[in-house]
């Protein structure tokens, strides 16, 4: 029940600041499950007082078609912002296509979510984020990565199991944050998305402390 979730958050002095995850929004005939999940995300925004939803798209379509479907999703979302997250193994693999889709949708509530791991695994340099695009970035997620990626066929496995804490890998998390700041991004949320079996295996308390300490170091660098 809603009140039970709110009670848990209150007990631990926590706040939900981002809602996810809408997928398969480009399908002509969306399944009942996806329609329900979408409505649940809208409800979660209302419940937690969150203004944006993180969305991904695994299926690969043209910019024009994807933009039209994003426009329809944005219309259904109404007052909520739809944050499209480019991921290298997805149908929106990089900033270039993400920006083209968001721009072509023509929706004020269509925006981007940028993640360090997805950025570096798409082999993008830290100098391509323009002030124009920056205005359309709703939130960022920071972490780090190994120098060498997993093979392309299993790259998603690395994303879901083997990311690194900010500043502890080979990909210059501070450089990513500096790019974000220099471009003029004003993120609603700075998420720390360290999806790591090894770090979580240390225990919740240890994982939280380790991630927090390394994130703090990175943010102080910039």
What are these language model-derived features?
Residues 72-170:
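Acidic/histidine-rich catalytic cores of soluble enzymes
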Residues 49-50, 79, 137, 185-187:
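A structural motif
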Residues 1-5, 37, 173-176:
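Alpha-helical scaffolding within the catalytic cores
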Residues 8-18, 24-112, 203-207, 214:
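Active-site acidic/histidine proton-transfer and metal-coordination neighborhood
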Residues 189-206:
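A short, acidic, flexible beta-alpha connecting loop/helix-capping segment that sits on the rim
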Residues 56, 143, 193:
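Conserved residues at the C-terminal ends of beta-strands
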Residues 168-183:
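A short, acidic, amphipathic alpha-helical segment used as a generic capping/interface helix at domain edges
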Residues 9, 45, 82, 115, ...:
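Conserved, mostly hydrophobic/aromatic
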């Amino acid at each position: 029940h809603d009140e039970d979730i709110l009670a848990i958050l209150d007990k631990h002095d926590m706040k939900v600041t981002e809602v996810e995850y809408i997928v398969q929004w480009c399908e002509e005939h969306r399944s009942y499950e996806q329609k329900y999940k979408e409505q649940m995300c809208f409800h979660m925004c209302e419940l937690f007082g969150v203004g944006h939803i993180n969305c991904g798209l695994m299926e690969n379509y043209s910019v024009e078609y994807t933009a039209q479907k994003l426009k329809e999703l944005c219309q259904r979302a109404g007052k909520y912002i739809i944050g499209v997250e480019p991921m290298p193994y997805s149908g929106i693999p990089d900033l270039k296509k993400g920006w083209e889709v968001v721009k072509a949708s023509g929706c004020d509530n269509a925006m981007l979510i940028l993640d360090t791991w997805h950025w570096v695994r798409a082999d993008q340099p830290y100098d391509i984020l323009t002030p124009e695009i920056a205005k359309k970035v709703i939130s960022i997620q920071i972490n780090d990565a190994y120098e060498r990626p997993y093979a392309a066929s299993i790259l998603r496995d690395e994303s879901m199991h083997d990311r690194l804490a900010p500043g502890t890998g080979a990909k210059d998390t501070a450089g990513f944050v500096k790019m974000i700041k220099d471009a003029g991004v004003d993120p609603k949320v700075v998420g720390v998305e360290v999806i790591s079996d090894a770090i979580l295996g240390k225990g919740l308390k240890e994982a939280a402390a380790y991630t927090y300490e390394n994130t703090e170091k990175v943010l102080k660098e910039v």
